[in-house]
A protein has these predicted regions:
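N-proximal low-complexity "stem/linker" segments adjacent to membrane-targeting elements
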Residues: 1-22
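Short, acidic, metal-binding catalytic loop of nucleotide-sugar glycosyltransferases
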Residues: 21-30
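A conserved acidic beta->alpha catalytic loop
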Residues: 37-45, 85
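Glycine-rich, basic loop-to-helix element that forms the pyrophosphate-binding segment
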Residues: 57-73
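Short aromatic/hydrophobic "clamp" motif used to bind/position activated sugar donors
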Residues: 78
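Conserved donor NDP-sugar-binding/catalytic core segment of glycosyltransferases
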Residues: 90-119
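Acidic donor-binding loop at a coil-to-helix junction in glycosyltransferase catalytic cores
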Residues: 161-167
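Hydrophobic helical membrane-anchoring modules
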Residues: 169-226
Length: 226
């Protein structure tokens, strides 16, 4: 069983190159890496071609980019990964092993925020507990799913924000997620730049607004203007 690693990118620069360097061992084992460009103007992007199996171009938007990557994937399992992630060497093995021994069709990893502030430790713990309790995953937790199942549900909804929450709700009707305690480290840059408490409150409010029916387009406008 093989995995297609799909990475949507938009001006991710140095973080992207660091990620790609770190996962080359997976290519050697027959897994593929697909980079989906949403309109980069970062010159460092052009140096990454030899580190991936496919480079695709599409309009910006994570949902659009990830769906395009899935459409060109060859392997049985799709693994959607953010460009600012840092991964354990055993991540791919863990995905394959847990899907094979269970009846689950999808899953996600626990998350660790990269910064050292003590509040980030509390936030990441709350995020992991919430995800395990609700069966809802966020994109920075590295969502993985059988390609056949992804195709059956028509992939990510083409919405501007909350595409990860939306697809989780549909996937958990089929099965609960595999919740791997192996951690993906994700950048805490946005938390530190915008303020940890401010960012936490914003994320909670956006999620609440999504659940009560505020449109993803409106939420995207609020998120990016903040």
């Amino acid at each position: 069983m093989r995995v297609s690693i799909i990475i949507p990118v938009l001006n991710d620069g140095k973080q992207l190159i660091q990620l790609l360097d770190s996962i080359q061992i997976w290519r050697e084992e027959g897994h593929e890496i697909i980079l989906v460009d949403g309109g980069n103007d970062d010159k460092s992007f052009i140096t990454t071609g030899h580190l991936v199996d496919k480079v695709l171009k599409t309009s910006p938007g994570r949902a659009t980019q990830m769906n395009e990557g899935a459409r060109h994937a060859n392997n049985e399992i799709l693994f959607f990964l953010h460009a600012d992630s840092i991964l354990d060497d055993n991540c791919i093995f863990a995905i394959i092993h847990e899907l094979q021994i269970s009846n689950n069709v999808w899953g996600r990893f626990d998350i660790k925020l990269s910064g050292t502030h003590w509040m980030l430790r509390i936030i990441e713990r709350m995020m992991n507990i919430r995800s395990r309790t609700t069966g809802i995953a966020t994109g920075d937790q590295g969502i993985f799913v059988y390609r056949e199942i992804f195709s059956q549900i028509n992939g990510y909804a083409n919405i501007e924000l909350m595409e990860d929450i939306e697809i989780s709700k549909r996937l958990k009707r089929i099965s609960p997620p595999v919740c791997l305690d192996t951690r993906i480290i994700t950048s805490s840059r946005k938390w530190e730049q915008k303020g940890i408490l401010k960012t936490m409150m914003l994320m909670w409010l956006l999620r609440l607004a999504f659940y009560i029916g505020v449109s993803p387009r409106r939420l995207s406008s609020i998120y990016y203007s903040s």
